[in-house]
């Protein structure tokens, strides 16, 4: 097993963890329907940037 040679200080430990915070997802509101979706993704009702790009009934 790996064993540290010297104790890490609280400062060094916390500086290492400074990038571990969770970030929230980037959400967008669809222009035409007002529905919320992930950025650069088609909204659940098939719209993207104000245009209908996917028919809800199709299996594609």
UniProtKB/Swiss-Prot annotation:
Compositional bias segments (type: Basic and acidic residues): 11-22
NCBIfam families: rpmF_bact (TIGR01031)
One Gene Ontology molecular-function label: structural constituent of ribosome
Annotated stretches, region: Disordered: 1-60
Transmembrane regions: none
Source species of the chain: Pseudomonas aeruginosa (strain ATCC 15692 / DSM 22644 / CIP 104116 / JCM 14847 / LMG 12228 / 1C / PRS 101 / PAO1)
Protein family membership: Belongs to the bacterial ribosomal protein bL32 family.
Keywords in alphabetical order: Ribonucleoprotein, Ribosomal protein
Protein name: Large ribosomal subunit protein bL32
InterPro entries: Ribosomal_bL32, Ribosomal_bL32_bact, Ribosomal_zn-bd
Lineage of the species this protein comes from: Bacteria, Pseudomonadati, Pseudomonadota, Gammaproteobacteria, Pseudomonadales
GO biological process, one term: translation
Family annotation (PANTHER family): 50S RIBOSOMAL PROTEIN L32 (PTHR35534), LARGE RIBOSOMAL SUBUNIT PROTEIN BL32 (PTHR35534:SF1)
